[in-house]
Design a protein with these regions (language model features):
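Class I SAM-dependent transferase core
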Residues: 2, 9-115, 123-127, 131, ...
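Conserved nucleotide-cofactor-binding alpha/beta core module
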Residues: 107-227
Length: 251
């Protein structure tokens, strides 16, 4: 059951749900959390020491959110290595470093309203929900969207909503957004996403001339010319949609 009325679950109370009040957590989830807590803490330590993730709140989110819950049971033993893992429908869950870096680049706080494109199995959505006030996530594959929504609800997260449609169009009904994170690589920055970003807001997106490789880009929206930064090479599944790659194209 969700919170009454329009009450919002804060990041602190999500943390409480994960660890401080485990007596109210279903026994299956309680077991999963306890079993993988040490690998999760080691992963966060590597992110700080080897990958220079500096935001303490992002590192805490990576410690708290159970990545293994968002992959198949057969892959849970690999969930805390720094690599992407396959999920259904030829999609992937991003490597922890990329999740942490993209989240850090958004500069979130508890009042942030965030749009996520490419929710996949819901892991990045859960990380964002730990740090932000409200997260609206889009996943173009309907079954993945439904599964992601079910997972985050099962973990007691009520400040995130996942919907299935074309993410390159954004979700204007809940904008403008303080931050937008795109977890798929596109040929260009979709105009609707810029339009739905607040002035001063940040958009983090992989952009590349081919579907196979990209550069991680951060756009900071300004009144006139926007500030665009590059943050290194990356490789994501293609961003499919009206303002992305055509479905089935190779270029």
């Amino acid at each position: 059951m969700g919170p009454p009325g329009n009450a919002r679950i804060t990041s602190d109370s999500i943390a409480d749900r994960f660890f401080k009040e485990l007596s109210s957590t279903p026994s299956r989830i309680k077991t999963l959390l306890a079993e993988y807590r040490i690998p999760r803490e080691r992963m966060a330590d590597r992110l700080r020491e080897n990958y220079q993730i500096r935001d303490a709140n992002v590192l805490e989110a990576m410690r708290r959110i159970p990545r293994h819950f968002f992959v198949s049971e057969a892959l849970r033993g690999r969930a805390y290595g720094d690599h992407a893992l396959p999920i259904s429908f030829n999609q992937t869950i991003s490597q922890p470093f990329i999740v942490a870096r993209m989240t850090e680049l958004l500069g979130l706080d508890k009042n942030s309203r965030i749009l996520e494109i490419g929710a996949g199995s819901g892991y990045q959505t859960a990380v964002l929900s730990y740090l932000a006030g409200q997260v609206y996530a889009i996943e173009r594959i309907g079954e993945l969207a439904r599964e992601a929504q079910a997972r985050i609800r099962e973990l007691g997260i009520y400040n995130a909503t996942v919907k299935a449609f074309d993410g390159t169009l954004g979700w204007s009904a809940h904008g403008p957004y303080d931050g937008i994170l795109v977890a798929a690589g596109g040929p260009r920055i979709p105009d609707p996403l810029i339009a739905q970003l607040k002035v001063g807001g940040r958009l983090v997106i992989p952009i590349g001339e081919t579907r196979e490789s990209q550069k991680l880009v951060r756009v900071i929206k300004c009144e006139s010319a926007h500030k665009i930064e590059e943050h290194g090479p990356c490789q994501f599944v293609p961003l499919i949609g009206q303002h992305g790659w055509p479905e089935g194209s190779r270029q």
